[in-house]
Regions:
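Short loop/turn segments that flank or connect secondary-structure elements
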Residues: 2-138
Length: 138
């Protein structure tokens, strides 16, 4: 993500930084009022990612049908976004079990955290990652 940001012109980085700070403020306000935050990613420009070639895995999978199997046996399924489902009108559901990929990703994260001596989890949105980056000055 940050490697992609580094390739952008400075004025665009500043604009994204301002947008990220705005999104973070809006999310905090939503949460303070008991609302579920639903805010657009600060990298979004006219429905497209401004860092398309550097986007995160979760972004690459957005809109694709999914299936997740939880340890308690429950299964969560999503059919995907209308653009995806519109390409396959004759199919009610296209199975894509992400569980093995997320397990591998979790194992990689644990391995990295152990090697780096990190003892806490980091759960940040893209807006938060950008807003907390000292190299991004709005």
């Amino acid at each position: 993500l940050m490697a992609g940001m580094a390739h952008l012109p400075e004025d665009r980085r500043r604009e994204i930084g301002r947008d990220a700070l705005t999104v973070c403020r809006q999310v905090a306000e939503d949460e303070a009022c008991g609302r579920t935050p639903r805010r657009m990613c600060p990298l979004n420009t006219a429905g497209r990612c401004g860092l398309h070639s550097h986007r995160l895995m979760i972004c690459r999978l957005h809109g694709v049908p999914h299936e997740l199997r939880f340890p308690d046996g429950t299964v969560s399924r999503g059919q995907g976004c209308p653009v995806f489902t519109g390409r396959f009108p004759d199919r009610d559901y296209i199975p894509f079990d992400r569980t093995p990929f997320y397990r591998k990703l979790s194992a990689l994260e644990q391995e990295f955290r152990k090697a780096a001596g990190l003892d806490r989890k980091f759960k940040m949105t893209i807006a938060q990652m950008i807003a907390h980056d000292p190299d991004i000055q709005p």
